[in-house]
């Protein structure tokens, strides 16, 4: 909603906002209105069971999309690959048992850390496959990639676009534009404030 009012939206009425931070979720706008579903929980994209990977999601289920395409998945995979002998600018921090944050990984990416870039591109590819399904179903004009990992820019955006071209129907995706959020990691916070303000004035 924040992106809809103050970000990348320029008249589009059918939009999917993908928030890729520690977790993974989406916001859906249909005909200019937020779609919340019956109970208000629409958009739990990260908990679509997509993988037979036996990785336990924080929701208590196994194989959720979030276990392969989120900030938490990125940190887990980075630590797994370092444990298998691969080298990263963050290797010393991992060996010293210092907790890693997404800011650390983004900073390493900006310094051309090959492992971090590779992992982010892999997450982009996984996301793109599943965003393809959303595009086929909802036929949005605009898909906005936001959240912490959107700060990696083209490293995550280009694999998403490539996967969408590969896995979605051309008749549908030709009307869809995919962009990085203007508001970045602040879109959710700004959107919450704007929704609260809107509801206050409605009352």
Predicted feature residues:
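Active-site neighborhood for divalent-cation/phosphate handling
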Residues: 1-3
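ATP-binding/phosphotransfer module of carbohydrate and carboxylate kinases, centering on a glycine-rich
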Residues: 5-11, 52-56, 61-203
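Glycine-rich phosphate-binding loop of actin/hexokinase-like ATP-binding domains
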Residues: 9-69
